[in-house]
Amino acid sequence: MDLKGLTAVELGKKIQAKEVTVKEAVEACFAQIDKVEKEVNSFVSLQKEAALKRAEEVQKLIDDGTLTGPLAGVPVAIKDNMCTEGVTTTCSSKILSNFVPTFSAEAVLNLEKAGAVVIGKTNMDEFAMGSTTETSYYGETKNPWNLEHVPGGSSGGSCAAVAALEVPYALGSDTGGSIRQPSSYCGIVGIKPTYGTVSRYGLIAYGSSLDQIGPVARDVTDCATVLETIASHDVKDSTSVERQDTDFTSALVNDVKGMKIGIPKDYFGEGLDEEVKKPILEAAEVLKNAGAEIEEFDLGLVKYAIPAYYVIASAEASSNLSRFDGVKYGYRTKDYEELHQMYKKTRSEGFGPEVKRRIMLGSFVLSSGYYDAYYLKALRTKALIKKAFDSAFAKYDMILTPAAPTTAPKLGASLSDPIKMYLGDIYTISVNLAGLPGISIPVGRDAKGLPVGMQLIGDCFQEKKLFQAAYTYECLTEKKWVSMYDKTETAGKGKA
């Protein structure tokens, strides 16, 4: 039986039905990894021995009826900025290359309680700072649809692993689009939940007011199932929200009749590639024909989202990353005579160029002479962006936009031009600033065969509406091309 093309829920059903053992599911993942990993480079580390041992433990719990959930026995990959007890957690940075946490992130623990089997930690942009997964200390990840292109970022390793059929689903984190943009580039489904829905305990912080953990998978059902599993109130995270409506799979209904969907005109103007625009508007037409009410409107403020985001995120990063100094854990330079010299050399040698750039920017905007001019102004802009979304959601159930302005760029195209890389997140950043949920779903491909993703944005705590609309679209289009990539046959070119 070919297991690698199954979704997480499909695989979970076969495990519960005793058609497949957990060990067979894990071995199928590693067999695919052996075939494709050298080219794709999705993983920073693999835990084969531990995963096989865990598979035996989970199998016993399934056999005796203790574990009956949809993800029991299903392999998962974890982005390498989430702590995993006893397993190296690097943030794809030299400075944490030897860091082994003594605890696991709450989201990881929730998956393990549900019977998931962690098979490895995925590659990412260093400290989640980047949009291409090219800033990793462990080398670039490549897009499984075309190995000459980036997978997006910063959760590029998680998304590439799912697209390359190395694992049924994975966890990513999203600070400014780091789940939704690579999901779009890799032709999979990814959701950033409302801020506070998933505990950030054990997530190594980048921008604490913006970071949120979410799943990436091959279809909407998997995403809803995983989010339902990892969402929980956690007293260890002061920003965690206690919700009673996290039964997200109940929203998997093929029906959008009467839903009001707004299309912001300013998201479809200059800068949007025509090969991206066309399939997204066609997808909107599919929802309209199914009974949704589609209307264009002016959202405004989108042009201010990127500058506001990079001021706020960099300011928070400069503070969060000050803890990495070589004293208690992580990399420490060998060549120093005095303590202050050790700090300086450790950080200079341990951080990559993009991380240094953002630390410098953050330190600058927080300095006494510029705090009011930049940081406070960015916070005011953030509040205005939230207000603009509030006005839109008074009229619409959700907002439909592109997930990214283009399909995946070529490797190296953005490294020499940081502004170009930052603009790759222009349609996703405002969602983080406002703390809203957003989902990216595949809707087509461009002339090169690269995937195009559509983003649906909801009001706070309205993930169910997003899942319902996304699931309806998926049903109506029969998922004709989703997960068609098979590396063993196509050598990274994708299928027509």
Predicted segments with their positions:
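Short glycine/serine-rich loop/turn segments
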Residues: 71-213, 264-266, 315, 401-419
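An N-terminal boundary/leader segment
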Residues: 1-53, 289-291, 364, 482-496
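Short helix-loop capping/hinge segments that flank enzyme active sites or metal/cofactor-binding pockets
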Residues: 71-91, 250-262, 315-386, 437-451
